[in-house]
C-alpha cells in the first residue's frame, strides 16, 4: 500500500509550530509510514532548523506529486509569506496570523482536490488571527468555513481512548445549559457517523454524566434524568449502541481499558483533562464532519519557549501517525 501524503501547515511562525515540524521530520520513521508535505515558508523552516540544531534539505515544490518524500529532505510548498526580519518570536503579530491562515487555506485546497490524503495541523494563535482580520477563532472553525462544513466535531484520541465534546469554547455555565436532549441525541448520531467514516463500523458509545455520581437520581442535579437519559433512549431506538450516563470519575478509565469505542464528554474541560492526564504529549485532536481527514497536535504555540528549540515533537509525530492510521479507511461524504 502506498504511503499516504500528509499535508502539514507550519502554523504560527512566531510559535513552536515550525520547530516541531522540522523535529518530527528529522525522525526517519515519519518517512517509513507517510509522505509528509509541509505548507509554509522556506525561510521560517530554515530558521527553525537553526533553533533546533538540525540540518535538513528543503525541497520546494509547487504540487504534491513533485515531492521526493525521503529522509533528510523536507518537501515544501513555499508560500513565501513571512518577512523574517519583521518576525518577532513569541509575540502576537498580524503577519504571523495571516501566514498561518494562508498555510491552512492552501492545505485545505489540496485536500479538497484530493491531492493529499490528510492534513496534520500545528499550533496557531487566536490573537494573531484576530490581529490579521481573520473572523474565526480556531482551526475547527477555519476548516469548517473553508470546506463549507457545518459545525465540525472535535474528537480527542490518546491510545485507544476517544472522546467527543458536546460543547467546546463556551463558559462552564453556558456548557451546562447546552446539555439538552435534542443536542445530545444529535451529537450521538453525528459522532456515530464520524467513527464509521474513520473505519469503526459498529461503535459502542458511553455518555459521561454531568453532575457528581451522575446526579444520584436527582440528588445532585437532574440533567442526567431529564436530558441525557431520554437522549440515550432515543439514540438506542435509532440503532446506536450507547450506554450511560456513566459517572465522569470512572467513564474515561473504562474507555481507556477498551469498554467503549468512544465517550461523549459534556463539556470542554471534562474530556480535555481526562485525555491529557493519560498522556499530554500523545493526545491528538481529530476533526470529524469535514470532507477530508484532519488530525492535530493538542497544544498551543508555546510563545514562552518559541525559538529555543526546546519544544517536543512527540505530539506532531503522533498526529502524523494517527492520520496515517485513519487515512486508508476514511470515507468522504
Curated annotation (Swiss-Prot):
Comment on bound cofactor: Binds 1 divalent metal cation per subunit.
* Subunit: Homodimer.
Q: Which domain of life is it from?
A: Bacteria
Q: Does the keyword rRNA processing apply?
A: no
Gene name in the database record: pdxA2
For this UniProt record, the keywords arranged alphabetically read as follows:
Carbohydrate metabolism, Metal-binding, NAD, Oxidoreductase
The family annotation for this protein states:
Belongs to the PdxA family. PdxA2 subfamily.
Alphabetical list of Pfam families matching this protein: PdxA
Q: What class of enzyme is it?
A: oxidoreductase
What protein name applies here?
D-erythronate 4-phosphate dehydrogenase
